[in-house]
Design a protein with these regions (language model features):
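Short, surface-exposed, charged amphipathic helix/loop patches that serve as local interaction elements
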Residues: 29, 34-154
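Extended acidic low-complexity intrinsically disordered regions
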Residues: 2-17
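Short acidic-hydrophobic surface loop/beta-edge motif
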Residues: 20-28
Length: 154
């Protein structure tokens, strides 16, 4: 128990999970979301600045594997450029987006209270189309945001 938790008392400790949980509805389902710590959010944002280059390279190789025979490509500085667009930068952006989606989905709480810390982007992609993935991230971001205003009907 933390110093603050001790000061707030036993009742707080019993209800701590509820205090740190918010909900939103989508498609008739109520999703529970763990409000992340500042450190968890900072770790995600820091990853954007410095993603795993091996993962970016894997994404790049998948993007360009069939492009060598396409007309109009330019090979330049260890990159393939199509219509002035760097495939390496595209791969980086794709990887960062998938990372963000996965990390935000991990804030969801399973129906029986289990964490989703073990999921991968492949798990997310097999369950939800990209449009739903982006909607989930948007909804999660709304409820964990400091500007979030909880509305309860009494």
């Amino acid at each position: 128990m933390s110093k603050l938790g001790s000061a707030l008392g036993q009742k707080y400790e019993e209800n701590r999970l509820a205090v740190l949980t918010r909900t939103f509805d989508l498609g008739g389902h109520t999703f529970k979301v763990k409000v992340p710590s500042v450190q968890e959010i900072e770790a995600i944002y820091n990853y954007y600045k410095n993603p795993n280059e091996e993962e970016v390279e894997k994404a790049y190789q998948v993007l360009v594997k069939d492009l060598k025979t396409v007309e109009g490509i330019v090979e330049k500085d260890n990159d393939i450029v199509i219509e002035d667009r760097s495939m390496r930068e595209t791969a980086r952006n794709k990887h960062i987006l998938q990372y963000r989606i996965t990390e935000y989905i991990k804030f969801l709480i399973g129906e029986n209270g289990e964490t989703l810390n073990h999921i991968t982007y492949e798990d997310v992609e097999s369950e939800f189309p990209l449009a739903i993935q982006l909607t989930l991230v948007e909804k999660i971001n709304e409820v964990i945001s400091p500007e979030y205003k909880e509305v309860r009907s009494k």
